[in-house]
Curated annotation (Swiss-Prot):
Pfam families documented for this protein: FAD_binding_2
Enzyme class: oxidoreductase
Cofactor requirement: FMN
Annotated GO CC locations: glycerol-3-phosphate dehydrogenase (FAD) complex
Entry-linked HAMAP family: Glycerol3P_GlpB
Family: Belongs to the anaerobic G-3-P dehydrogenase subunit B family.
Catalytic activity, EC: 1.1.5.3
Quaternary structure, from the entry: Composed of a catalytic GlpA/B dimer and of membrane bound GlpC.
Single GO BP term: glycerol catabolic process
Keywords: Flavoprotein, FMN, Oxidoreductase
Function description: Conversion of glycerol 3-phosphate to dihydroxyacetone. Uses fumarate or nitrate as electron acceptor.
Pathway per the UniProt entry: Polyol metabolism; glycerol degradation via glycerol kinase pathway; glycerone phosphate from sn-glycerol 3-phosphate (anaerobic route): step 1/1
Name this polypeptide is given: Anaerobic glycerol-3-phosphate dehydrogenase subunit B
Length: 420
């Protein structure tokens, strides 16, 4: 099987890179081992919320020079501030072409509400998310935090309590919704995605409107768990129109409706452009030459995927893009050079709430995001997303930005080289 580009990993980075290449007529295949981190995400995208020294960032572009000084191995520092600034409008345009509706701008961070009622700096948020600092922020002065009886993946009382501590007159109550009784009988099935599949049905809309109308009497807005709008995001707007007050959604424990919705939109866009996705398969090894890369997958061991270029978007430890042994960290498909602390005790901190050193382990790359094998740079291989070294996606609030920007950075280079 021959393609222009083979991408290993079907998460945010892999799909974004594939979409950009496919838009320009490149034949792309994505080998995807299974559920990716988007299934566990809030659906919001961060760019840069903190510098490595902990200093908060409100205007990400203004912080790139200082980031390069503090973290020269950070992917943004590798790509360069000028490249990052040039790619950001392209990222937002690509998401819009993928029919993903988001609020925010790379010029200025805003605040999104977390599932515990706190606020975190953010670049782009779902249009039905709970935000502050945007013209469309609308969670009200005395919102109702509406939980669902028996649903353990969202705690409305905790959210209301956190907001009350911030001076917001929030209160909580639970929806009974007998239409969900069948799901309640099996707690393992009483999850956000399954609830959304029930509540999104038109025949169940009237019951939901009736209960919310009663519970929210006297409240100027409603905040619900993200158990709506899985396949039809407009459901939330229709519900708000029926009630006459804004409705916003908060992420739940995984699987996440908002994250899954983002993944579905990107996957659909890639396939519509002619891209090939091989779900449930796993790249196990590869052979390299200057003219071609052959990727062998678990299900197609004897029929390699051949391409002039390969892009590694396999993620970090979470998705086995990086693998730990007792004394080392390795990249399992190509055997890339990986930067990690030589002493095992330097991998982590005892306090789980402080930045962990292992989060910054990853593949060593140059400014073009070419990785190395045995110290030698591989010119037709690229690495993008969470497999890269030099950044902490949690402490620095930059995981989505690294995935999106590195993906487009590499796609543009492949397109330029392919047109020479």
């Amino acid at each position: 099987m021959r393609y222009d580009v083979v991408i290993i990993g079907g998460g945010l980075a892999g799909l974004t890179c594939g979409i950009r290449l496919a838009e320009q007529g490149k034949r792309c295949a994505i080998v995807s081992a299974g559920q990716n981190a988007l299934h566990f995400s809030s659906g919001a995208l961060d760019l840069l919320s903190h510098l490595p020294d902990g200093q908060p960032v409100s205007q990400p572009l203004e912080a790139l020079d200082e980031l390069a000084r503090q973290a020269p191995h950070h992917p943004y520092s590798r790509m360069g501030a000028a490249a990052v600034a040039a790619l950001l409008p392209q990222v937002e345009a690509l998401l819009e072409r993928s029919t993903i509706s988001l609020l925010g701008s790379y010029q200025q961070n805003h605040w999104r509400m977390t599932p515990l009622g706190k606020f975190r700096a953010c670049w782009l948020s779902p249009v039905d998310g709970v935000t502050r600092g945007l013209p469309d922020s609308r969670f009200g002065d005395n919102p109702l935090i509406a939980g669902i009886e028996g649903f353990l993946d969202f705690q409305s009382r905790i959210v209301a309590g956190t907001l009350q501590a911030q001076g917001i007159a929030a209160r909580s109550d639970d929806l009974k919704l007998p239409v969900l009784d069948r799901l309640r009988q099996n707690p393992s099935e009483f999850r956000a995605v399954n609830i959304a599949r029930v509540l999104d049905r038109p025949e169940n809309r009237a019951a939901l409107v009736e209960e919310l109308s009663l519970l929210a009497n006297g409240n100027d807005a409603i905040i619900m768990p993200a158990c709506l709008g899985l396949d039809s995001p407009e459901v939330v707007g229709e519900l708000a129109e029926a009630l006459g007050k804004p409705i916003s959604l908060l992420p739940t424990l995984p699987p996440s409706v908002l994250g899954l919705r983002l993944h579905q939109a990107l996957s659909q866009r890639f396939r519509q452009l002619g891209g090939m996705v091989m779900p449930g398969d796993r790249a196990v090894r590869a052979s390299l030459s200057a003219q071609e890369i052959a990727v062998h997958s678990h299900h197609h061991r004897d029929i390699p995927l051949r391409a002039k270029y390969a892009v590694l978007a396999s993620g970090s430890f979470f998705s086995n893009g990086l693998v730990t042994q007792f004394d080392r960290v390795t990249e399992p498909v190509f055997g890339l050079d990986v930067r990690f602390a030589e002493q095992r005790e330097g991998w982590s901190q005892q306090d789980v709430f402080v930045p962990q050193p292992y989060m910054q382990f990853g593949a060593i790359v140059d400014e073009h995001l070419h990785p190395r094998i045995g110290g030698e740079t591989i010119g037709n291989l690229y690495a993008i997303g969470a497999v890269l070294e030099g950044f902490d996606p949690i402490a620095q609030g930059c995981g989505a930005g690294v995935s999106l920007l590195s993906a487009l950075h590499v796609a543009e280079q492949i397109l330029k080289e392919g047109n020479l």
